[in-house]
Design a protein with these regions (language model features):
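Domain-level signal for soluble alpha/beta catalytic cores
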Residues: 1-369
Length: 369
């Protein structure tokens, strides 16, 4: 049995209030009784007299949507469309409240000529400040555009969409969609690791949903977002066929640009795109090649042997070993050489400084201007 808890008098009062607000038809549904209907009929036939300052219908004043403005879009997208060779640099959010080092690093990179700052989200599943807050802070305090790393792992649909709206409200327009690192390797291995969307699905949600003014359920969100969406790409994958299929799906779902895993052998990267083009045609979207400056022999050996998707040629590892204590300087020289090698076919580079050495990234940017 369905019960309606409110009494007839209350029901009748609001029936008349709805009439005054403009309702053309008022009725009772599940749980209402004949007494409720009689009270409604009486209230509608004999409305109470209005006093001079009585409550009437609520007047709703709609504020016009704020204009998008000339700077609401992605400046990174504009540069890529114009054929500018762009430089993106990854930064990690702080582990606490202090942002002095972060902002100083962003300012250094901006002065060197970085096109955009990429802000990572909980790299290696370590607890850090939320990246969309960092993006807003860097853009406001330093004035350099940012790209928000947006992993799907650990987010349900509610949080995904809420975080996207928050980022857009803070002025973030570039989003780099990734799966994210599993919590098992980080600070809280027992933390929930569930997700509702894979990266390909999130790309579709943003480009075919939010950027058209609707959410995942098809409900309107008002003014459409204007996100410029990047996707991840591994140019030396353990399963080439699967990576090629993922690339095709990401393109079909609307990816605007791609950031690759660190590259140390340009010929391998070029071969990947030749293989894709042979069966699918040109990728047709900007590629920003990952550049991770080597810091020393241990660093190079770790990346080569323990990080999936990264292969460092023997010749480069030999150079780093021979450099000894000058390993960081040799790493910068190798990075500059790699950038010059990919410049003819890439639309930019994505520099990932090791151990927070933003000064080395700035040196690389200065050298390739």
């Amino acid at each position: 049995r369905i019960m309606y808890p409110a009494g007839p008098e209350y029901f009748g009062h609001y029936a008349d209030a709805f009439r005054q607000a403009g309702a053309a038809l008022v009725g009772g549904c599940c749980g209402t009784t004949p007494g409720h209907i009689r009270a409604m009929r009486t209230a509608l036939d004999h409305p109470p007299k209005k006093s001079g300052n009585g409550n009437g219908a609520v007047r709703i004043i709609e504020r016009p949507e704020e204009p998008a403005g000339p700077d609401s879009g992605s400046r990174l997208a504009e540069k890529l469309r114009a054929g500018v060779f762009v430089t993106a640099v990854e930064m990690d959010p702080p582990r606490g409240l202090s942002t002095h080092k972060l902002l100083a690093g962003a300012d250094l990179l901006s002065e060197a000529g970085a096109s955009v700052i990429n802000v990572a989200d909980s790299p290696m599943a370590r607890m850090r400040m939320s990246p969309w807050g960092v993006c807003g802070l860097v853009q406001r305090e330093v004035g350099v555009e940012t790209t928000l790393h947006f992993p799907t792992r650990g987010r349900n649909l509610l949080r995904v969409q809420g975080d996207l709206l928050a980022a857009h409200a803070l002025g973030v327009r570039n989003v780099f969609v990734v799966m994210g690192d599993p919590t098992a390797i980080g600070d809280y291995p027992e933390a929930m690791d569930n997700y509702d969307l894979a990266p390909t699905g999130l790309i579709r949600l943003i480009k075919q949903g939010f950027n058209t003014g609707v959410d995942h359920s098809g409900s309107e969100i008002g003014q459409p977002t204007s996100f410029h969406v990047g996707a991840a790409l591994n140019l030396a994958p353990p399963d080439l066929k699967r990576e090629l299929q993922l690339l095709k799906r990401k393109l079909a779902n609307g990816a605007d640009f791609f950031l690759t895993q660190p590259v140390y052998d340009p010929s391998v990267a070029k071969a990947f795109f030749e293989t894709y083009s042979a069966g699918n045609g040109d990728v047709g979207k900007p590629i920003l090649v990952g550049i991770l400056p080597l810091f020393g022999t241990r660093h190079a050996n770790f990346l080569h042997n323990e990080v999936p998707g990264i292969e460092i040629p023997d010749a480069i590892r030999a150079r780093i070993e021979a450099a000894g204590s000058d390993g960081p300087k040799e790493g910068v020289r190798i990075a500059i050489e790699l950038i010059e090698a990919v410049r003819p076919w890439a639309q930019g580079v994505y520099i990932i400084p090791a151990f927070g050495r933003y000064d080395l990234a700035a040196e690389i940017i200065e050298a390739i201007k």
